[in-house]
């Protein structure tokens, strides 16, 4: 259903639709020794500590034009962090309303617009490593849940830029219903056919993307994987010049196998690569 400013839908009471964006990013690297793996985990833990994550979520809140009611943040031992922000709505300025219903990438934090009520933003981090293979991964799980007119997809552009991930999985769903003035139920209040429409072209050219959408259920799923692979970008503490060719090939295989398994959500046997 298309909503536009010139032909507004008249609602009965408040817009009761709940819109939720789940954004998961993965960073993958290879650390040669146990000490290197521990150093990577410590580096990631510091890079994405509770204070840094709070800064990112605060910028998300500004982008969608909300007021912060409460912030709860926590760093964990031995690693990981989480932040939860409760937010409430800001009034929408008339000249900004048109931007709220467009199926286009959202702004970066310099531009502030949106509308929220009874909503929350959360992030949790999950650093880990393989006990034997030298592979280390970091996952950040961000949920932006809103009630009202604006879609949390407006924050997606900024989140993509904030993490520059190797792999991303994004889920968007709309739940509940609101009513027009005749009492007719509305189960979605904006046009959408893909989450990809909210990702800028310069980002889309860098990733291979797959959509799995269930339109009749208002469920949209997109996963992305970097096209370009440069081994130097995945080595922690040294470069490929420090490795023998045979070792480079072995590490490249391990990294690509790890990325395949994360992207497709299943384990692959070695025979798959022969």
Curated annotation (Swiss-Prot):
Reactions performed catalytically: S-adenosyl-L-methionine + H(+) = S-adenosyl 3-(methylsulfanyl)propylamine + CO2
A biological process term (GO) from this entry: spermidine biosynthetic process
Post-translational modification comment from the UniProt entry: Is synthesized initially as an inactive proenzyme. Formation of the active enzyme involves a self-maturation process in which the active site pyruvoyl group is generated from an internal serine residue via an autocatalytic post-translational modification. Two non-identical subunits are generated from the proenzyme in this reaction, and the pyruvate is formed at the N-terminus of the alpha chain, which is derived from the carboxyl end of the proenzyme.
InterPro entries named in the record: AdoMetDC_fam_prok (IPR003826), S-AdoMet_deCO2ase_bac (IPR009165), S-AdoMet_deCO2ase_core (IPR016067)
Organism domain of life: Bacteria
Keywords: Autocatalytic cleavage, Decarboxylase, Lyase, Polyamine biosynthesis, Pyruvate, S-adenosyl-L-methionine, Schiff base, Spermidine biosynthesis, Zymogen
Cofactor notes: Binds 1 pyruvoyl group covalently per subunit.
Modified residues (Pyruvic acid (Ser)): 119
A GO CC annotation given for this chain: cytosol
Active site per database record: 119, 124, 147
Subunit structure: Heterooctamer of four alpha and four beta chains arranged as a tetramer of alpha/beta heterodimers.
Protein name: S-adenosylmethionine decarboxylase proenzyme
Organism whose genome encodes this protein: Clostridium acetobutylicum (strain ATCC 824 / DSM 792 / JCM 1419 / IAM 19013 / LMG 5710 / NBRC 13948 / NRRL B-527 / VKM B-1787 / 2291 / W)
């Amino acid at each position: 259903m298309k909503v536009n400013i010139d032909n507004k839908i008249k609602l009965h009471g408040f817009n009761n639709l709940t819109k939720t964006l789940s954004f998961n990013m993965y960073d993958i690297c290879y650390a040669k020794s146990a000490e290197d793996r521990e150093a990577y985990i410590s580096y990631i833990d510091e890079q994405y500590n509770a204070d840094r994550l709070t800064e990112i979520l605060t910028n998300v809140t500004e982008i969608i034009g909300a007021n912060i009611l409460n912030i709860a943040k926590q760093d964990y031992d031995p690693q990981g962090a989480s932040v939860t922000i409760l937010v409430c709505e800001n009034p929408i300025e008339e000249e900004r309303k048109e931007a709220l219903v467009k199926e286009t990438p959202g702004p970066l934090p310099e531009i502030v617009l949106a509308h929220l009520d009874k909503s929350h933003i959360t992030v949790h981090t999950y650093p880990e490593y393989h006990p034997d293979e030298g592979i280390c991964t970091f996952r950040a799980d961000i949920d932006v849940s809103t009630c009202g007119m604006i879609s949390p997809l407006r924050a997606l552009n900024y989140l993509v830029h904030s993490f520059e991930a190797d792999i991303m999985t994004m889920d968007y769903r709309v739940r509940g219903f609101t009513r027009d003035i005749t009492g007719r139920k509305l189960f979605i209040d904006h046009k959408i056919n893909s989450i990809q429409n909210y990702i800028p072209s310069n980002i889309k050219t860098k990733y291979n993307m797959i959509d799995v959408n269930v339109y009749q259920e208002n469920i949209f799923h997109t996963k992305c994987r970097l096209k370009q692979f440069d081994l130097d970008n995945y080595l922690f503490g040294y470069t490929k010049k420090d490795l023998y060719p045979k070792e480079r090939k072995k590490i490249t295989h391990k990294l690509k196998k790890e990325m395949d398994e994360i992207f497709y959500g299943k384990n692959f046997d070695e025979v798959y690569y022969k």
